[in-house]
Amino acid sequence: MNPPRITAFHALTHRVRWRIFAFLFAFAFIAYFQQKGLTVAAERIMPDLGISQVQVGWLEWAFVLGYAAFQFPGGVIGQRLGARVTFTLIGIVAFLATVLTPLAPRLLQGSALFLMLFALQLLMGLAQAGIFPVGSGVMEAWFRPEKWAIIQGVQTMGMQFAAAATPPIVALLMSSVGWQKALFWPALPAIVVIALWAWYGRNTPNEHPSVSAAELAELDPRSLQQSPTTISGRRIMQVLANRSILLLTVSYVCMNYVFYLIGNWCFLYLVQERHFNILESGWLAMIPPLAAGLGGGIGGKLVAVLVDRFGIRWGFRLLPMLALPTSGTLILVAVNLNNPYGAVGALALAYAVLELNEGAFWGATMYIARSDTMSATGVLNTGGNIGGLIGIPIVAYLSGGGHWTAAFVIGTVLALLGAVMWMGIDADKSIG
């Protein structure tokens, strides 16, 4: 039986699932604002605290280490505790790590300060690791399969819009109140969102008192019949041994080297290699993530159209096989352009084309894993952040020596390799 037809406006205003998704969007936005602040403030932090660019790279690496290491455990914990409790814990710990970072220099200095900053970045990574795996499990429970790639794309918009907003906001605040307050004050709204989620959020539609019978009828019966909190060692091993999930993970490693290259290093690249000043770099550095946010939203819809037209297997394959090589080519174009503004435009386009693929990666994993989506996307995003673990020290070393072009060439090669992996991925074969 087909779900009842309702208007898009009525769904957005009267359906609880869209309010739940609004929280997921907000979590992604807040998480990326918290993550990117240190990178933008690095140009002021380095001379103020006597920290080198390589050390800044290690601070970013500490976050990615915690973030990568706890992706899969975070997904498993999310399945065990449920999204309501897990997101509340994530929010509290990440908030504390964020606000303690600018306060640490008041108490410590030298090596002790660097170790404290390293520990706080590691803690933030551990805390935030579960956001996207647990969020994907919420999407699996609250939305029909044909919407998964679309809403994953929209969530990508949230995180990229935060990445776009961070450079100008932090740069402007640094110019007026200093880098410490620039990192502290924007963190405070997160507390309100966490409190609202703890009050309103639920793990599944069946648990929410405001979900009507009409809304339940619109949802996927298979998702409603499964409990996301049941997890066993056997099911974990099925996730870890699945060929398509492993290939998705390897491909995501390759893609995320490029993701971190543009997302984390664009600001410093514009300052050091293209010789823009701090404020202008702050404004220009928001262009690539804005473009990437639009790319994420468009990509989710494109995947849905392709799946409807070509079926699940090729519908998910086609976009990454085309978009990843295109993005890799565009970053080479960017670093070889003489016009600095043209380089910004090429980087923005490369990032947008790269982020077209988010809906394909996450949506395919959800199709394969179904009720084990939290664990499976934890595996996927572990791979994605291994790309960052590999890439951050490489880019820090190469950029510190002025060899930015070499860092971008590596990205081109990995983008091509990531596209090849998709030939072996079949999202039409689910686990179990």
Segments the model singles out, each with a brief description of its role:
Residues 38-40, 241-297, 358, 362:
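Extracytoplasmic gate region of multi-pass secondary transporters
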Residues 155-208:
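Helix-loop-helix hairpin linking two adjacent transmembrane segments in secondary transporters
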Residues 97, 112-130, 341-356:
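Hydrophobic core of transmembrane alpha-helices in multi-pass small-molecule transporters
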Residues 92-110, 325-338:
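C-terminal ends and interior cores of transmembrane alpha-helices
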Residues 36, 64-72, 129, 163-164, ...:
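Residue-level signature of mid-helix packing/kink "hotspots" within the transmembrane helices
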Residues 313-360:
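C-terminal transmembrane helical hairpin of 12-TM major facilitator-type secondary transporters
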Residues 120-159:
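Cytoplasmic helix-loop-helix junction between adjacent transmembrane helices
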Residues 19-53, 262-267:
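Extracytoplasmic
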